Structures are given as C-alpha cells and as structure tokens.
Amino acid sequence: MAGHSKWANIKRQKARVDAKKGQTFTQLSRAIIVATRNGVPDPAGNFQLRTAIEKAKAAGIPNDNIERAIAKGAGTWENDSAFEEIRYEGYGPGGVAILIEALTDNRNRTAAALRAAFSKNGGNLGETGCVGWMFDHKGVIRLEGTIDEDKLLEASLEGQAQSYEFFDSEEEGQGAEVFTEVSNLERLNKVLQAAGFKVKEAELRWIPTNTLEVSDREQARFLLKLIDTLESLDHVQSVTANFDLVEELMLLDL
C-alpha cells in the first residue's frame, strides 16, 4: 500500500518545508474566512474550518485574529471584503505544469500579478483547465515521529487510505504522509488519531499524476525562482508543480 509522491514537494527537496508554502498571517486568515463561508462558523461541525484554525494556531496567529476571520466568514464583521477561491493554471520553463490556488477580492488584479510573475520567469499563465487534468486532488494527513509500518498499514486500511509514504530527514525529522480521497479526509484523520498516531496536519493538496525530471541547472533556477515569486504574492495560498529535480541539482544552491 505504500506509495511515493515524486513531487513530495519541491520545498522538501530544497529544505523549505514548514515555512511551508510560505503562508503569512493574512493568507491563513483568508483560509479561515473561506472555510467558514463554505460551511458553518463552528469548527466542531466544519472540518475545513477546524484544520484552517489548527494551521493558524501553529503559525502563532492570536486568537483574536482567528475569531475576527471567523466573523468575517460568517458575515458578522463590518467592512468585510468578499474573497473568492480561484484556481489558476500555467506553464513554467520547459513546459512544467503549475497549479495555483488563490483567495482574492479582485480576480483581475490577481491574474495580472500572476501573469507578470510567469512572464518574468520564462513561463506563461494559461487558460482554466490547461494543466488541471495533470493533477489529482487528494486529502493528505501528515504524521510525526517514529512509525510502525504494520500499525500504519492496519489503520490506513481501516480508514480507507489510498497510499502512504515515509520521510526521514534532518530538516523534517521522521514521519509519514497518508493519502486519501478528498471526501474521506476527516474520517481517515479520526481513524489515525484513534490509533495513536500524532497528526501534525490534515490538508487538501494537488498531486501531479506524473512528473518531469529537471536536470538542467538554468531551467531549475528559473523554475524555483518562479515558484518563490508566485508564493510571495499576497493572494496566493498554494503552488504545486509537476517537476522533480535530479539529485545533483538538489545539492546545489540555486
């Protein structure tokens, strides 16, 4: 049942993991707003909101800010901007597929900023659907600590997980990521916690169905710069791409 995600996140390969997706207080607060609007303002009955709040607390966001974001999402906060979730798609250098999730109150301004970022780094912003078919939307649960594989396999089968993969590095420590269908994320999370696993994070993630191996140093440099530029944009929540650096490039300071 063990699986391996080749993307397994380019940020992991470049030791950028938990600065993870470079999410700022603003981005995390917006995630709470949208999660509230998509469900109910009570985290007990809204798994998306509950996980958004957990991420915010882990990042050190004060409770007052979290409560304010929930109020905005529930429509009980004055002067509230209407944020909407939008997925943008494009190509990086060498035809690498890039998927961007954004929360924005001005889709034209966000699209213009993304288009500029792509064009300055050898890529181009495409039409909706141009690369989306190259990715699967999955629920991902990240476990921490030393893990017994037999125990994980048993819990994964009970929780109807699709696959899992282990990680062990100086930057991340030890643990595993367990993958499942989006609709099964909350159920699997409960099963894994009940089995005694330490759940660090439960999230939805785009996983590339296939990856392109990048061996050219210049292409890799432009790709990483493009990813960094996209992630730094205010309304961008996440960036996923379908490339994998060869080992020699991972050891270089690009």
Swiss-Prot record:
Its main location: cytoplasm. One of its GO terms (biological process) is regulation of DNA-templated transcription. GO terms for molecular function: DNA binding. The keyword Transcription applies. The keyword Chloroplast does not apply. InterPro entries: Integrase-like_N, TACO1_YebC-like_2nd/3rd_dom, TACO1_YebC_N, Transcrip_reg_TACO1-like, Transcrip_reg_TACO1-like_dom3, YebC-like. Pfam families: TACO1_YebC_N (PF20772), Transcrip_reg (PF01709). It comes from the Bacteria. It is found in: Cytoplasm. GO terms for cellular component: cytosol. This is Probable transcriptional regulatory protein MAE_13580. It comes from Microcystis aeruginosa (strain NIES-843 / IAM M-2473). The lineage of its organism: Bacteria, Bacillati, Cyanobacteriota, Cyanophyceae, Oscillatoriophycideae.
